[in-house]
Structures are given as C-alpha cells and as structure tokens.
Amino acid sequence: MKALILAAGKGERLQPLTDYKPKAMLPVCNKPLIDYQIEMLRKHGIDEVAVVIGHLEKALKEHLNVKFYRDASISGTASAVYAAKDFIDDEFILLYGDVFFDGSINELIKTPNSMAVVQVGDVSRYGEVIFRDGKLVTIKEKSGSGSGFVNAGIYHFDPTILDFIEKTEESNRGEFELTDSIMMLNRSEKVRVVPVNGYWNDIGYPWDYIDANMYMLNKIGFSAGENTEIWSNATIRKPVVIGSDCKIKNCVIEKSVVGDGCVIGEFSIVKRSIVMNKSKVPHLNYVADSVIAEGCNLGAGTKIANLRFDDANVKVTIKGKRIDSGRRKLGAFIGYNVKTGINVSIYPGVKIGSDSWIEAEVSVKKDVEKGSFVRN
C-alpha cells in the first residue's frame, strides 16, 4: 500500500510560526512534524509515500526524498488530493499534513473505503462525525459542545474518490472540501468509520503546536545534541530536549525544547516553551508557555508574561478573530529573526511577526505585524 500526505496549505492560523516554514516542517522536539508522519506510516509497512506541496515547498523538497505533487491553487483538501491523481492508481492511505498521531492505524488499513475518527472531549472546534454500526451517517461542520468523535484526518481510499472530487463544488469558504467529496462517496457506497486510539493532535493553532512538543518531551525525557555545553550550575528540570551546538549557561530550563545553536544565558528562565534554532535567550529573560522561532535575540531583561492579571483564559487573535485558547497560562508566539531591546515586556497571547524589532522598554500589548519596528 502507498500513502499520500497533504502539505500544501499556508498554515495561516499558525502564523508567525509558518512565516518561513510550511507547517509540516515545524519541529516537534527538533524533528519536523512530517518525519513523525512518515515514520508512523513505515511502522505500519507503508514505504511508498508522496507529498502534495504548495506553500513554501522548497523546504519540503530539500528535506524529503519522496514523490512530490504540486497543488498550484492551494484551494482546499479535495484540490490537494486531485493534484496527486497520477499517484492514485490503487488503494492508499491519506493523511493531512498537520495531524500528529501516535497510535495504530492497523484497523484502518484493513478497512477499504474508510475514515479514522478520534474521540475528544469537545467536538465544537472540529465538527462531529456521526456514524452507526461502523458506517458514516454525516459529518457536521459545526456542532455543539460535548464529547464525541471527530475526523482524524487519516483515510483509506481507492481511485474511486477521484470521481467524486471531480464533482465537488466550491464551498462557502471558497475551497474544495474533501469532506464534501466523502459525503458524495458515502451516498454511492457507504464509507466505513474506524475509531483509532493513541495520541492525536490537529495542529491548527499555535498552542496545539506547544502541546505536541510537550507530548514528545514526556516520551523522550532528556536529550542533548553534540557539542552542546551545559554549565554545571544550570538547572535542567526534565523533560528537556536540547539540540546541538548550544550554550546552556547559569539558567533554568523546565519542560522545554531548545533547538540547535541556541544560547540560554545567565539568570534566564525557560518553561514549557519551544526555542527554535539559533535563537538567543541570553540575559535575565523569562519565557514561559511560548514559542520563539529561529534566529531571534531577546534583549537583556525581556520577559514574556503567561498569565492574565484577572486569571481569565488567554485569547489570541487568529485571522482577525479573538480565539479563546482554553488555557489560563499562555505566553507569546514570536516569529523568525525578531530582536528585542532591553527590558521589553510581552503580554500573554501576543504574536510578533517575523523580522520585527522591538525597541528597549516597550510593552507589547497587541500583535506586531511582520517586518515592524516598534518604538515607545
């Protein structure tokens, strides 16, 4: 059997983390998300893998040795599958590129014309999959809150799905949705529904990305790469993953991921966070429940707040809408090549776009656009 991974999307809800990386290349404990997907597929005996690319495709093409198919329009999941129609000549497993799954898909592989579902505590974010006696009834785009089964973004199809993709009309969102194609297929021949067990994370929001890293941290425990220097008076509270060529000085690192070539300096504290490659947290910094992308440099005394003064849930602006993260503690999401001056304060839930500079003593209370220079 073969597999197709959809990795063409822009990952707009994950910005600024996807400013310069496709979401499938975002590192989870310093390894790209798509590597975990390919490893999971190969663990199930699936060696022939193709990837649909589009946005920031160069990174994927340089990293992977697989077949690539380009979705030039980037106009929905159905469009992405159709871009690889020449690859689809037999049964295949289809996997969304932003799904992190650590579990078994053996039953899905055994079940032709099927979709995987997972049980979650709140279906409202995902839409609910209704099925009876193992057969699909409907997929609710928006559902009420409460527990239920949701689309896991993993499928087992054959070339017949292409016939229904060709008939799929543009949705209200201006996209060609694979779920619409599946419902048409279901009216022709019943789609089977396969519940799967294991860790599942649809990495749609920046805090989902933190959660995926926290899951893998707990599995790994501790690791440090080659040529990394850890001072004897550094405090490392496991689980912690540190990359290669880092300098870990007199600091505290707790349940965090540090990429290659990073500096965590004197009297800095990094907790439940991801610091990507070649970033510096060098002096008297506080970083908690946050993500710092590659090539950043925090000025001395720069601190990221992770708790609202009123103890309410932290909200984040995603594509112009204020979204409740569902968590009391959440810091900031800092894009690539960001520099801050001394004593900068960054409020909870703030996003700072890539290539931005923040002047000394500034309090960053709202999102910063990419390429900005923020002054007092």
Residue ranges: model-predicted function:
Residues 234, 239-240, 246, 251, ...:
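Pentapeptide-repeat beta-helix register
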Residues 97-100:
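The conserved acidic donor/metal-binding loop of glycosyltransferases
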Residues 103-126:
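Conserved donor-nucleotide/metal-binding helix-loop-beta segment in metal-dependent transferases, i.e.
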Residues 272-376:
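Glycine-rich hexapeptide-repeat left-handed beta-helix
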Residues 216-235:
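Long, charged amphipathic helices and adjacent flexible linkers at domain junctions
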Residues 263-265:
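Surface-exposed extracellular loop regions of Gram-negative outer-membrane beta-barrel proteins
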Residues 93, 106, 135-211, 216:
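Catalytic-core segments of class I nucleotidyltransferases/pyrophosphorylases
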Residues 2-5, 13, 19, 26-27, ...:
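Conserved N-terminal catalytic core of the sugar/cofactor nucleotidyltransferase
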